[in-house]
From Swiss-Prot:
Pfam families: FTHFS (PF01268). One of its GO terms (biological process) is tetrahydrofolate interconversion. Its EC number is 6.3.4.3. ATP binds at residues 65-72. This is Formate--tetrahydrofolate ligase 1. Pathway: One-carbon metabolism; tetrahydrofolate interconversion. Belongs to the formate--tetrahydrofolate ligase family. GO terms for molecular function: ATP binding; formate-tetrahydrofolate ligase activity. It comes from Streptococcus pyogenes serotype M18 (strain MGAS8232). Keywords: ATP-binding, Ligase, Nucleotide-binding, One-carbon metabolism. The gene is fhs1. It comes from the Bacteria. PROSITE patterns: FTHFS_1, FTHFS_2. It is an enzyme of class 6 (ligase).
Length: 556
């Protein structure tokens, strides 16, 4: 079979002006970035606000292997299949970060015959959103350092600046740096550091803002530092929220592209789910819901991370909750959770599938807590055997969850038809009655304990010395009513990435909280989760090149 990029480059793309007509978007409603990419205008988003929202399908997954289990690919294939069934459907996905593209992933625009196009553009600079977010973030850093240099009227303690610089690359050498060295004219020396752009609070804000006014308010509410007497300093104190909004005025508009099958797709925003809330923008999802009968969206990593945050953090900002949740599972990942070594995952092992099923079962039970119907999608791989597939289907039947085999990577829309039909049937027969896991009125401590015990299956939560102090401080500042966004490994329900399956007798330690008051949540840091990733021993970048005619090579 051809590689992802070979398949993508063999497709005759339709002009984006033709694609968007399928969902009632005219040429005057979009701002073109070439022939095949566009941004949706504020006027069109405003015009459809009164429309009744369509059905919403959330795609999530079990705890993944390092290669991922194919949520984006499944989302794309499912949307294409729904369209093939005659359902007016849109996709609402995140846009890739260059860091993982150059690092371990090599691309994040789907795969095989379930891709969004033009995949080279989407994986690289796209419409410049990532660069705008990076620039806004680093402009704020520069303005903070300038405030220190110009007299520090706010009394900012340079030792307690919590705002970091960012870069849309994996670069471990920049995790901790010292700025302002050389001479007094170079600024006030202090410790600083870089996060990856998708970990920036500005990325989260862009993805939760409902319009420019809301964007500006959220930017003003960012906490950047503390004063010498330990009081928080906000962006509004620096009076630069207007400038930051100006930098982001185009980046906030959702991007329109197409799938291989011509399904309209809104690709916008890209926060990671292990260090942020892991969902595409509220604007993209809300607009898709008002333009289409069915919207397919996804949340990053496993359901314990992305889906939990989608349901607890994003849904309160949407016109509606999901009508159904699709949990993607692969036999290779289930075997890994069943104790099989990575080198042996290709060998048939039905017993390991049975053991690893505990991971999928917990995710199904967790999603059912939110009172939303669940469907399991088996993402088919070449090495899967009939016996393993039959074993998994039988296990799903035991817990009464609908399950379908999907081969969208190999067969595109046709490979997702059975899943699409089952999803539609479930939505028609079983109405969702969304229930949030916790209340805003719960304390931060109660919210964390709720997530750890109800979603992760943990026994208890340990709060480190710094976290204990912050619980008191944040309550004094009025931040304790915000949702919690857990920063945790994606590979396990616990904070130990090697503890696979469905562990129960474990504690999770919160070492620190990070206020993201502009985004509207508090991040709880667990384990060794890094907000600036490093590159692997053999980065995907080493296989990338460009042909003499400008064609991209090596993306996948």
């Amino acid at each position: 079979m051809k590689s992802d990029i070979e398949i993508a480059q063999s497709v005759a793309l339709q002009p984006i002006t033709d694609i968007v007509k399928k969902v009632g978007i005219d040429g005057d409603d979009i701002e073109l970035y070439g022939k095949y990419k566009a941004k949706l205008s504020f006027e069109k988003m405003k015009a459809v606000e009164a429309n009744e929202p369509g059905k919403l399908l959330l795609v999530t997954a079990i705890n993944p292997t390092p290669a991922g289990e194919g949520k984006s690919t499944m989302s794309i294939g499912l949307a294409d299949a729904l369209n093939q069934m005659g359902k007016k459907t849109m996709l609402a996905l995140r846009e890739p970060s260059l860091g993982p593209v150059m690092g371990i992933k090599g691309g994040a625009a789907g795969g095989g015959y379930a891709q969004v196009l033009p995949m080279e553009d989407i994986n690289l600079h796209f419409t410049g959103d990532m660069h705008a977010i990076t620039t806004a973030n680093n402009a704020l850093s520069a303005l903070i350092d300038n405030h220190l240099q110009q007299g520090n009227d706010l009394g900012i303690d340079p030792r307690r600046i919590i705002w970091k610089r960012v870069l849309d690359l994996n670069d471990r050498a920049l995790r901790q740096v010292i700025v302002g060295l050389g001479s007094p004219v170079n600024g006030v020396p202090r410790e600083d550091g870089f996060d990856i752009t998708v970990a920036s609070e500005i990325m989260a804000i862009l993805c939760l803002a409902t319009d420019l006014k809301d964007l500006k308010k959220r930017l003003a509410d960012i906490v950047v530092a503390y004063t010498y007497d330990r009081k928080p300093v906000y962006v509004r104190d620096l009076k630069v929220e207007g400038a930051l909004t100006l930098i982001l005025k185009d980046a906030i508009k959702p991007n329109l592209v197409q799938t291989i099958y011509g399904t309209p797709a809104l690709i916008h925003g890209g926060p990671f789910a292990n260090i942020a809330h892991g969902c595409n923008s509220v604007l993209a999802t809300s607009t898709a819901l008002r333009l289409a009968d069915y919207t397919v969206t996804e949340a990053g990593f496993g359901a314990d991370l992305g889906a939990e945050k989608f349901l607890n953090i994003k849904v309160p900002n949407l016109p509606k909750a999901p009508d159904a949740i699709v949990i993607v599972a692969t036999l290779r990942a289930l075997k890994m959770h069943g104790g099989v070594a990575k080198s042996d995952l290709a060998a048939e092992n039905c017993e390991a599938v049975r053991l690893g099923f505990a991971n999928l079962k917990r995710h199904v039970e967790n999603m059912r807590q939110f009172k939303v119907p669940v469907v399991v999608a088996i993402n088919e791989f070449v090495a899967d055997t009939e016996a393993e597939i039959a074993t998994l289907k039988a296990l799903c039947e035991e817990i009464k969850v609908p399950v379908e085999l999907a081969s969208v990577w190999a067969n595109g829309a046709e490979g997702g038809l059975a899943l699409a039909k089952t999803a539609v049937r479930v939505i028609d027969q079983e109405a969702a009655d969304y229930k949030r896991l916790y209340s805003d009125e719960d304390t931060l401590e109660e919210k964390v304990i709720n997530i750890v015990t109800q979603i992760y299956g943990g026994k208890a939560v340990q709060f480190g010395p710094k976290a204990k102090t912050q619980l008191k401080q944040f309550a004094e500042f009025g931040w304790d009513k915000l949702p919690v966004c857990m920063a945790k490994t994606q590979y396990s329900f616990s904070d130990n990435p090697s503890l696979l399956g469905a562990p129960t007798d474990f504690d999770i330690t919160i070492r620190e909280f990070v206020p993201k008051t502009g985004a509207g949540f508090i991040v709880g840091l667990t384990g060794d989760v890094m907000t600036m990733p490093g590159l692997p021993k053999v980065p995907a970048a080493m296989a990338m090149d460009v042909a003499e005619n400008g064609t991209a090579l090596g993306l996948f």
